């Protein structure tokens, strides 16, 4: 689980970098709306939400209350490039 949480943190940092590239600054983020996480896992692994806590906890640490979000945690048998975690997110930004 700990390695998965580290992978989730790395994935969310990548998403934050994409936000900076798109809007110029994380200061424009007014709310993290949703995080959708996919965990590359075997058939006997059931702790997908615990893995995604790595990403969710980082968002709350970084953004405070506006970092709280809805979340989906799904286990899958494979991900592109055999990555451990893939994340998409919905973010509200201000002008």
Task: Enumerate the language-model features and the residues they cover.
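Short, polar/acidic, helix-capping and beta-turn segments at strand->helix junctions
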Residues: 1-95
């Amino acid at each position: 689980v700990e390695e998965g949480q580290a992978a989730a943190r790395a994935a969310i940092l990548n998403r934050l970098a994409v936000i900076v590239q798109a809007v110029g600054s994380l200061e424009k983020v007014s709310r993290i709306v949703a995080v959708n996480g996919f965990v590359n896992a075997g058939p006997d692994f059931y702790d997908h939400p615990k893995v995604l806590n790595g990403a969710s906890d980082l968002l709350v640490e970084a953004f405070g209350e506006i970092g709280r979000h809805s979340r989906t945690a799904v286990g899958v048998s494979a991900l592109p490039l055999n990555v451990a975690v893939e994340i998409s997110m919905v973010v509200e930004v201000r002008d």
